[in-house]
């Protein structure tokens, strides 16, 4: 007769056997390919500013050699120099057999608008600078609250019909505006937006609450800019720098510096970074990855981005060395759970003053 303990073990074994999939099912599961990785896009905002043409060419070459194919620029980047440099690289952008994809953007700033004439003028100027017949992705860089959105979207439809761009993208729009735009485009038979570019990183997660569900509903993929919070998540800055040495970068010495300081340069953000640094040391010891590496690994492995949806991270840089370090970080694996927990604590520390993702 079986003892009570034996009966318990036997029942457990039967229960496990009933729950375990048959060998062929296990083999099928093991043979499935891993889920698609979150993609990487090269952000070119510093080309023509802190990176000259040769440095920019080297960066693009290094990026493409890693197997990535998407480049991101804008009409306004470096007063047009970013597009001009990219156009001079001989990549054959916009050609039918070109494996490199290029995105640019029209904006409503500095005397421009998203009225039909301005949208057309900006895109056609961008095409001349890029030396290509069409761009793969054309963004509306931010809302133009002084122009009816129907006018802008109708203009985009005409430009798309003329073959000047393939996909339509949105950037810095509120979720309700995305819903309105998708509804208008669908009801009018106009080209629907398929990509949204927005601000997202380990300590800036406002997009998760309402925007991400909206994008999933309407089928837009998400491309994240500022994955390092403008460089703050490198850990190289100190809060006191704003009153002291003011190192050249996103936060000092350029026309967008004040915008970036207002976005991220807050005491709680520096406290949050210190918290992550402490967790990295505790989890990894002498072999601890940099804050930069950890922040990028969080984006690729622990954020709400999904490769299956076509989501991507936009990697900016101010030098080839910086780009190569960032690309190496994107190829590293997930973080230790304690570090992921520290990033979550860091987010809760700064969530109350998170900058809006929309403008």
Curated annotation (Swiss-Prot):
One of its GO terms (molecular function) is electron transfer activity. GO terms for cellular component: cytoplasm; cytosol; extracellular exosome; Golgi apparatus; mitochondrion. Coiled coil: none annotated. It comes from the Eukaryota. Residues 1-38 form a transit peptide. InterPro entries: AKR_Detox_Biosynth (IPR050523), NADP_OxRdtase_dom (IPR023210), NADP_OxRdtase_dom_sf (IPR036812). The active site is at 77 (proton donor). The record marks 105 as: Lowers pKa of active site Tyr. NADP(+) binds at residues 72, 171-172, 197, 226-236, 250, 318-326. The modification N6-succinyllysine is found at residue 236. Keywords: Acetylation, Cytoplasm, Golgi apparatus, Lipid metabolism, Mitochondrion, NADP, Oxidoreductase, Phosphoprotein, Transit peptide. Catalyzes the NADPH-dependent reduction of succinic semialdehyde to gamma-hydroxybutyrate. May have an important role in producing the neuromodulator gamma-hydroxybutyrate (GHB). Has broad substrate specificity. Has NADPH-dependent aldehyde reductase activity towards 2-carboxybenzaldehyde, 2-nitrobenzaldehyde and pyridine-2-aldehyde (in vitro). Can reduce 1,2-naphthoquinone and 9,10-phenanthrenequinone (in vitro). Can reduce the dialdehyde protein-binding form of aflatoxin B1 (AFB1) to the non-binding AFB1 dialcohol. Belongs to the aldo/keto reductase family. Aldo/keto reductase 2 subfamily. Homodimer. This is Aflatoxin B1 aldehyde reductase member 2. The gene is AKR7A2.
